[in-house]
């Protein structure tokens, strides 16, 4: 079975938690896009793991793979491996694989990203991790690949070839071009390549072989649907395609092999950084969602903007991803609100819209049209079965499912493994 899992909103929906829950049933868990600009949190008992590159299935028996559609900072990956091994989690080459075609984020990518953002009159909210510039080099066929990194001679030749153009680009943006040929940095990357060499594999081959043998494969997306480089809220997006279809293209798996597409949906909506968020709240309800939900970005630590559930956006996410089911997370955060609202449509200059406009500037002008539901005061964090949640919470979930037209398969009421149950 081949399952694709993506975030349906702007990221931070709780994908890592759901992947961790499902991983026990999957032989392979694979990351298919993004870089260390995305973060996922896995909570097991008192242990909290915050990772950016290693897929969420690392704590169970699954083999975890980093696919060629990702961009990889080898220093960050080495730090994650060290962190896990210090907590007693072995990260051997039997456990982790990295595709040979994976693009490497170099120090000059990070420098260029920071310089470009600092010069923008209107910030786009980049994490300044070098993600976009690494993808630019991939498209320009000017990248350093994982297969280059692990061969010191090829690596040095590639860096020598690109030095002049990278130095010129940094100089043009007012930076110090010496970072491109810094001998200490080059030595560091040579050593990183040597360390990571045992992990190199062919991810497409591994996945297709596993599927043909009747094994289960889970493709784990990063970020969220509306950060997609094509279909997201341009220009406030990431540099990769975050929707389900890109899993097949990036991993080299034919679309006829997909069995299930699972969307992760937060019971409200959040966004880190700039860009339109039609239901954004600046009142006590917004403060409640932010504080009770601990809404701070895993990667940046920035405060997340919070708003009510946005049905028009979710309708589009369902179309873009083809969800067969969804997991609803953070339902517990809505407890103790007198009223819970759902945005069912937008008002754009007097016109009712049931679906988001394509133009980002128009989306930012949309005013939400709400349905109001009764709130609840019950603490849901100890609930183990869907049948036992508060009546008003039950009504909220049923209303969302009815409006979405896609079955809610899982409901989450807290960060722990035991706080997610099937509906």
Curated annotation (Swiss-Prot):
EC numbers for this chain: 6.3.4.4
Reaction it catalyzes: IMP + L-aspartate + GTP = N(6)-(1,2-dicarboxyethyl)-AMP + GDP + phosphate + 2 H(+)
Record carries keyword Lyase: no
Single GO term (MF): adenylosuccinate synthase activity
Keywords of this entry: Cytoplasm, GTP-binding, Ligase, Magnesium, Metal-binding, Nucleotide-binding, Purine biosynthesis
Binding residues annotated for IMP, in chain numbering: 12-15, 37-40, 127, 141, 223, 238, 302
GO annotations of cellular component type: cytoplasm
Entry's family note: Belongs to the adenylosuccinate synthetase family.
Protein's name according to its UniProt entry: Adenylosuccinate synthetase
Natural source organism: Methanococcoides burtonii (strain DSM 6242 / NBRC 107633 / OCM 468 / ACE-M)
Gene name of the encoded protein: purA
